[in-house]
């Protein structure tokens, strides 16, 4: 009897000791230190699960004691293990395999929202990376030669890879070893990387980068509109700055936008028109194939201007900022990788051919916007279509920038820096409308004082494009999935981060130097 009692006391002491060690290990793990052994990590996981179940049971007992309903009437009580709890989410998540896991618009319960196919998702990505900014790629070949062509391929490969690893950061394994979607946006990934010490720092950095990129995109649309109209009608006594003012006057109603229903109707027409314009440019270039200057395509680079070309190429591939939302709205998220592969392969081939053929046609006379090289009769028609596309494309980044600003500064309750832009009836307040108009005017002023399409595009690509497409995805991937990565994945992430950082700094510095030089000499595009 004494032996049996001693044995039970020993077992109890051992169990208490193991749980204490597991809790201590868990405390160090939460502080950022890795557990010493796998057994301790397993012990911490079991202890944490038991602690959650115990607390959940206490809460349920209290609710029942108070007479509050717990679920549907007549329903069977939940069996242990039916509740899937995800640490850090603050709420239970639906079981694995449920459509509730992959919601849209930042909600995990978005199964009632319409989903898109892989083809539709690919069309959205194609619109993002095959936009009118490809018109600046021949200018990148002018300063980069064959290395510029290689960079078009390299940027496609890297952006495709970083898009995939960014989506991988949305998922984690739950207690059952099942991979579930626990995040819904780029901002959520950034916040998870900076938690627990700075839980909102990462999201703010991403928001700032996103706002800069969106506003710079709006500025580029105004710049290219003024540039195209000025070169289409050189005989008119209207300067490029005046054309930019006229374009902005047309865009001023964007300040009154509440949604993009009206604008979205023109998106398909704009995209088709852009493809037609690209075909017309390539057809004209092919008609002059006998005069192509192959000897002008060089292997050496212009050290000062080539970094600007890197920014132009990177900016033409930016799509990472909306990929989490896009993947969350797909009917089959498992097809995301295949969709990314084909869209970036197609973009790489089309961009490479367009840039090379256009440069071979005009060689050293290649301008920042390639349509400015077309003959007068063709140029006017093509440029008018391009201006229409630019003006119809402007509301999309403008509305997105306004939404980010409103959510960051005006709609976070007690944490908001300024009062809400909307009244209780949902109407936009007068000062909120004033701020929107001020944003439109700001894009105009930037377009007037910095009317250099390629330099602005290179600056934006080097600053926010490289950050959102190269630096942050690789850094987040290493931070969130470090323990699961293979050695070659770690190598790729580190290499992309280092190369992206060098290209970003170099391109940013040289773009600024180019803008300063152009401003001093009062050069016009």
UniProtKB/Swiss-Prot annotation:
Recorded catalytic activity of this chain's protein: 4-aminobutanoate(out) + n H(+)(in) = 4-aminobutanoate(in) + n H(+)(out); glycine(out) + n H(+)(in) = glycine(in) + n H(+)(out); beta-alanine(out) + n H(+)(in) = beta-alanine(in) + n H(+)(out)
Lineage, highest ranks first: Eukaryota, Metazoa, Chordata, Craniata, Vertebrata
Annotated segments matching region Disordered: 69-111
Organism: Macaca fascicularis
Gene designation: SLC32A1
Pfam families: Aa_trans (PF01490)
Main location: membrane
Any one biological process term the GO annotation gives: neurotransmitter transport
Protein name from the UniProt record: Vesicular inhibitory amino acid transporter
Membrane topology listed for this record: Multi-pass membrane protein
């Amino acid at each position: 009897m004494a032996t049996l009692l001693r044995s039970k006391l020993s077992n109890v002491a051992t169990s208490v000791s193991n749980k204490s060690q597991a809790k201590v290990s868990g405390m160090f793990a939460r502080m950022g230190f890795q557990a010493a052994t796998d057994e301790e990590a397993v012990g911490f996981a079991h202890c944490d699960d038991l602690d959650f179940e115990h607390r959940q049971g206490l809460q349920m007992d209290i609710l029942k004691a108070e007479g509050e309903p717990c679920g549907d009437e007549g329903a069977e009580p939940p069996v242990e293990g039916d509740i899937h709890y995800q640490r850090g989410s603050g709420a239970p998540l639906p079981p694995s395999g449920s459509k509730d896991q992959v919601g849209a618009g930042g909600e995990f319960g978005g199964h009632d929202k319409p989903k898109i196919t892989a083809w539709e998702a690919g069309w959205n990505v194609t619109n993002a990376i095959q936009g009118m900014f490809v018109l600046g790629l021949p200018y990148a070949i002018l300063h980069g030669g064959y290395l510029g062509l290689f960079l078009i391929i390299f940027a496609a490969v890297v952006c495709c890879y970083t898009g995939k690893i960014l989506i991988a950061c949305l998922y984690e394994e739950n207690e059952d070893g099942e991979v579930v979607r626990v995040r819904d946006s780029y901002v959520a990934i950034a916040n998870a990387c900076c938690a627990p010490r700075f839980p909102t720092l990462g999201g703010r950095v991403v928001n700032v980068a996103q706002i800069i990129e969106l506003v710079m995109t709006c500025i580029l649309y105004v710049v290219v509109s003024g540039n195209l109209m000025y070169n289409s009608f050189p005989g008119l006594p209207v300067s490029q700055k005046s054309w930019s003012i006229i374009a902005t006057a047309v865009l001023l109603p964007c300040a009154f936008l509440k949604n993009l229903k009206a604008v979205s109707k023109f998106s398909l027409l704009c995209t088709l028109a852009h493809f037609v314009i690209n075909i017309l440019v390539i057809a004209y270039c092919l008609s002059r194939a006998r005069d192509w200057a192959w000897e002008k395509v060089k292997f050496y680079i212009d050290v000062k201007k080539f970094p600007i070309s890197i920014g132009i190429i990177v900016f033409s591939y930016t799509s990472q900022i909306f990929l989490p939302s896009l993947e969350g709205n797909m009917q089959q998220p498992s097809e995301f990788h295949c969709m990314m592969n084909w869209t970036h392969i197609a973009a790489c081939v089309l961009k490479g051919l367009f840039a090379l053929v256009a440069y071979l046609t005009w060689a050293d006379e290649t301008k920042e916007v390639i349509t400015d090289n077309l003959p007068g009769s063709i140029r006017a028609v093509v440029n008018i279509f391009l201006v229409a596309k630019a003006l119809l494309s402007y509301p999309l980044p403008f509305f997105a920038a306004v939404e980010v600003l409103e959510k960051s500064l005006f709609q976070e309750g007690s944490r908001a820096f300024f009062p809400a832009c909307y009244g209780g009836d949902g109407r936009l307040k007068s000062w909120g409308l004033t701020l929107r108009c001020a944003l439109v005017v700001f894009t105009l002023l930037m377009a007037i004082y910095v009317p250099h399409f390629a330099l602005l595009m290179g600056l934006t690509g080097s600053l926010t494009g490289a950050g959102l497409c190269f630096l942050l995805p690789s850094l987040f991937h290493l931070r969130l999935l470090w323990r699961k990565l293979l050695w070659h994945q770690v190598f790729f992430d580190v290499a992309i981060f280092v190369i992206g950082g060098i290209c970003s700094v170099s391109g940013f510095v040289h773009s600024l130097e180019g803008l300063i030089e152009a401003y001093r000499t009062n050069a016009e595009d």
